[in-house]
Swiss-Prot record:
Cited SUPFAM superfamilies: Glucocorticoid receptor-like (DNA-binding domain)
Protein name, as recorded: DNA gyrase inhibitor YacG
Family, similarity comment: Belongs to the DNA gyrase inhibitor YacG family.
CC cofactor note: Binds 1 zinc ion.
InterPro entries for this protein: DNA_gyrase_inhibitor_YacG, Znf_NHR/GATA
Biological role stated in the UniProt entry: Inhibits all the catalytic activities of DNA gyrase by preventing its interaction with DNA. Acts by binding directly to the C-terminal domain of GyrB, which probably disrupts DNA binding by the gyrase.
Record HAMAP family: DNA_gyrase_inhibitor_YacG
Pfam families: YacG (PF03884)
Keyword annotations of the record: Metal-binding, Zinc
Ligand binding (Zn(2+)): 9, 12, 28, 32
Region of interest (Disordered), residue spans: 46-67
GO molecular function: DNA topoisomerase type II (double strand cut, ATP-hydrolyzing) inhibitor activity; zinc ion binding
Superkingdom of the source species: Bacteria
């Protein structure tokens, strides 16, 4: 069985074969990878959240005991 997985590049929608030889997968090229990274760095893309945390919210970490 020789199933070939093909995905679309998230940046330009060019088809990319998903295997070890596809260096930039899921992107088709280093250029498309850097365009995507730049969009994240410029905060054009983000992971949705339920809201911002503020100092009064409960945190999962324990406060440091500074003595």
């Amino acid at each position: 069985m020789n199933d070939v997985t093909v995905v679309n590049c998230p940046t330009c929608n060019k088809q990319v074969i998903w295997d070890e030889l596809s260096t930039w997968r899921p992107f088709c090229s280093k250029r498309c990878q850097l365009i995507d990274l730049g969009e994240w760095a410029a905060e054009e893309k983000r992971i949705p959240s339920s809201g911002d945390l503020n100092d009064s919210d409960d945190w999962s970490e324990q406060p440091l005991d500074r003595q």
